[in-house]
């Protein structure tokens, strides 16, 4: 259960994986685009997971319709603003929204830096309107290769002060982290924090690579860490957080069942692990589902669920002073 005495966070939440089905329909009509259906309920199976996908790449294809309708920078601003509203409506006090500007720009050849600016504007407007603390994480979409990621990084760096951290996401097997060392060197030079999707499709070696070569302070998903006891010890000793996404890992066939999910193992090993959504609109879930249904099904005790909630704030890419402000806000 969610502890109302603690700030509720979601630190692994994709902005471009949380585009409302109604918004996809609206923007499709606005830009005269051909969609797989022209009514909301008929469209939903095309943009939302209705059954377990065979692998991560198949899961990611469900996200494509959301970005396919981003025909203007104003459309990008709209989905960013709606993401803040959705986070506030979910009861979150703090969220880190991550997005890939190249992925959002690609279909309609929008300027990457312009997409970043539009997203920032939408987020800032949403934070003013909905009284929630949101930070932005830029994603390099490894699936599109090193050169595309350079364009993406340049676009993000053009607005570096509004970006908190850099992430690497996409096809983990086809594009290992070592290809992006220079990208992450530049990110660290800019003062950004680092989180990396690793150990989701690939094994523990991908997590080691993210830590040693890219400077990862947190790992997205990281389910394969349980296969390497030395890695588990290292994560616990160095407070490298695991951003767990329970339902997502089932839907991508990364984990066979919630009962087999390693989150409880992480917590019992002393690893800093938290509960997050991933792509709420695509998954058809929200943060409450993860706490009330998924976490108990994954074998977490009420005390472990509370610990995971507390870990979310501990892992957040904000200062201790900012964390205390969030705690004080709950108490008041």
Curated annotation (Swiss-Prot):
Pfam families: A_deaminase. It catalyses: adenosine + H2O + H(+) = inosine + NH4(+); 2'-deoxyadenosine + H2O + H(+) = 2'-deoxyinosine + NH4(+). GO terms for molecular function: 2'-deoxyadenosine deaminase activity; adenosine deaminase activity; zinc ion binding. GO terms for biological process: adenosine catabolic process; hypoxanthine salvage; inosine biosynthetic process; nucleotide metabolic process; purine ribonucleoside monophosphate biosynthetic process. The record marks 221 as: Important for catalytic activity. Its EC number is 3.5.4.4. This is Adenosine deaminase.
């Amino acid at each position: 259960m969610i502890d109302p005495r603690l700030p509720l966070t979601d630190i692994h939440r994709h902005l471009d994986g949380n585009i409302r089905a109604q918004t996809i329909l609206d923007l499709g009509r606005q830009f005269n685009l051909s969609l797989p259906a022209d009514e909301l309920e008929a469209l939903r199976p095309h943009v939302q997971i209705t059954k377990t996908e065979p692998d991560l790449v198949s899961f990611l294809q469900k996200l494509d319709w959301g970005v396919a309708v981003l025909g203007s920078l104003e459309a990008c601003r709209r989905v960013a603003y709606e993401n803040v509203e959705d986070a506030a409506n979910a009861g979150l006090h703090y969220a880190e929204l991550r997005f890939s500007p190249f992925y959002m720009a690609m279909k309609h050849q929008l300027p990457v830096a312009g997409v970043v600016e539009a997203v920032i504007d939408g987020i800032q407007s949403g934070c003013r309107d909905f009284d929630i603390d949101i930070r932005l994480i830029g994603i390099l979409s490894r699936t599109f290769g090193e050169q595309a990621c350079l364009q993406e990084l340049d676009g993000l760096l053009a607005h570096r002060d509004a970006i908190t951290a850099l992430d690497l996401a996409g096809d983990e097997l086809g594009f290992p982290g070592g290809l992006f060392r220079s990208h992450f060197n530049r990110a660290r030079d800019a003062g950004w924090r680092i989180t990396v999707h690793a150990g989701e499709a690939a094994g523990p070696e991908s997590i080691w690579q993210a830590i040693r070569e890219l400077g990862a302070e947190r790992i997205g998903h990281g389910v394969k860490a349980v296969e390497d006891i030395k890695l588990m010890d290292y994560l616990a000793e160095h407070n490298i957080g695991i951003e767990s996404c329970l339902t997502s890992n089932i839907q991508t066939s990364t984990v066979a069942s919630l009962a087999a999910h390693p989150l409880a193992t992480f917590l019992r090993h002393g690893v800093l692990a938290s509960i997050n959504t991933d792509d709420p609109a695509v998954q058809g879930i929200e943060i409450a589902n993860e706490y009330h249904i998924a976490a108990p099904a994954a074998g977490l005790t009420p005390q472990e669920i509370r610990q995971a909630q507390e870990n979310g704030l501990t892992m957040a890419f904000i200062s201790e002073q900012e964390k205390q402000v969030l705690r004080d806000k709950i108490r008041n």
